[in-house]
C-alpha cells in the first residue's frame, strides 16, 4: 500500500475507508439506541435473553471480581454481573457509542443498579484500562461492528488478568441449509420492515443483516482469538449457530 492510500474495510456489504467505519457504525446506533431493547425482543422473539443468560452462566462470575462488559450497550449483561460480583466487585460497562451508554446508564439507575457499576466510552481496539485488570471480559453482539477485530482481541487480551476469561457472544453461521434459507429470508425481508415500523429506520437493520453475513464464521473467529493470545479457545453454537458463544482464556 502506497503512502497516503486508504485502507478499506466492510460496512455491511459496502466497501468503505477503514477510518470512516466507526462513524458509520456510530450513526446506526445513535439512530436505534432509544428503541434498541424493544427491537432486540421483537426481532429475536425474546430468544436473546436466553443467549445472554447462558453467557452469564458460563462466565463463572463470583463476588469480588472485576468484569468488563464491552460494547455493553443498554446494560443487559452488566445488570446480571452487578448482582453476581456484589459490592466488593466491579463492573465496567464500556461502549464506543455515547447514545447507547446514556440509555444503559438511565435504565440501570432506574432499576437501582448503582455502586459497583461504572460507565466508560471506549474503543475496543485501544481499551483505556491497565494491563491485567479484569477477571472476565464479555463482548455481546459488538465484535462484528469493530473495524479492526484483531486489534480489539489483542487489546482485550492485554487488559485481562492471567487466568481470566473472554466471552464473545455474536451472530454467526447457521449449521443447516434449511435454517440458512429461513434465516436469510427473515434477515433481508422481514427484519428491515420491523426496523422501519418500530424505529423508522430500515437502513440500520439492513446493515445489521449484512454485518452478520460479513462477520467471521465460528472456526475463523476461534483462530483469530488464538492468534490474539487466547488459549483453550472453544465455542458453543446456539439456535443452530445463528449465535455462537466463543470462550478463551489468558494464562
Swiss-Prot record:
<dbReference type="GO" id="GO:0032259">
    <property type="term" value="P:methylation"/>
</dbReference>
<keyword id="KW-0489">Methyltransferase</keyword>
<keyword id="KW-0831">Ubiquinone biosynthesis</keyword>
<dbReference type="GO" id="GO:0009234">
    <property type="term" value="P:menaquinone biosynthetic process"/>
</dbReference>
<comment type="function">
    <text>Methyltransferase required for the conversion of demethylmenaquinol (DMKH2) to menaquinol (MKH2) and the conversion of 2-polyprenyl-6-methoxy-1,4-benzoquinol (DDMQH2) to 2-polyprenyl-3-methyl-6-methoxy-1,4-benzoquinol (DMQH2).</text>
</comment>
<keyword id="KW-0474">Menaquinone biosynthesis</keyword>
<dbReference type="InterPro" id="IPR029063">
    <property type="entry name" value="SAM-dependent_MTases_sf"/>
</dbReference>
<dbReference type="GO" id="GO:0009060">
    <property type="term" value="P:aerobic respiration"/>
</dbReference>
<dbReference type="InterPro" id="IPR004033">
    <property type="entry name" value="UbiE/COQ5_MeTrFase"/>
</dbReference>
<keyword id="KW-0949">S-adenosyl-L-methionine</keyword>
<comment type="similarity">
    <text>Belongs to the class I-like SAM-binding methyltransferase superfamily. MenG/UbiE family.</text>
</comment>
<protein>
    <recommendedName>
        <fullName>Ubiquinone/menaquinone biosynthesis C-methyltransferase UbiE</fullName>
        <ecNumber>2.1.1.163</ecNumber>
        <ecNumber>2.1.1.201</ecNumber>
    </recommendedName>
</protein>
<dbReference type="Pfam" id="PF01209">
    <property type="entry name" value="Ubie_methyltran"/>
</dbReference>
<feature type="binding site">
    <location>
        <begin position="123"/>
        <end position="124"/>
    </location>
    <ligand>
        <name>S-adenosyl-L-methionine</name>
    </ligand>
</feature>
<feature type="binding site">
    <location>
        <position position="74"/>
    </location>
    <ligand>
        <name>S-adenosyl-L-methionine</name>
    </ligand>
</feature>
<keyword id="KW-0808">Transferase</keyword>
<dbReference type="InterPro" id="IPR023576">
    <property type="entry name" value="UbiE/COQ5_MeTrFase_CS"/>
</dbReference>
<dbReference type="GO" id="GO:0008425">
    <property type="term" value="F:2-methoxy-6-polyprenyl-1,4-benzoquinol methyltransferase activity"/>
</dbReference>
<feature type="binding site">
    <location>
        <position position="95"/>
    </location>
    <ligand>
        <name>S-adenosyl-L-methionine</name>
    </ligand>
</feature>
<dbReference type="GO" id="GO:0043770">
    <property type="term" value="F:demethylmenaquinone methyltransferase activity"/>
</dbReference>
<comment type="pathway">
    <text>Quinol/quinone metabolism; menaquinone biosynthesis; menaquinol from 1,4-dihydroxy-2-naphthoate: step 2/2.</text>
</comment>
<comment type="pathway">
    <text>Cofactor biosynthesis; ubiquinone biosynthesis.</text>
</comment>
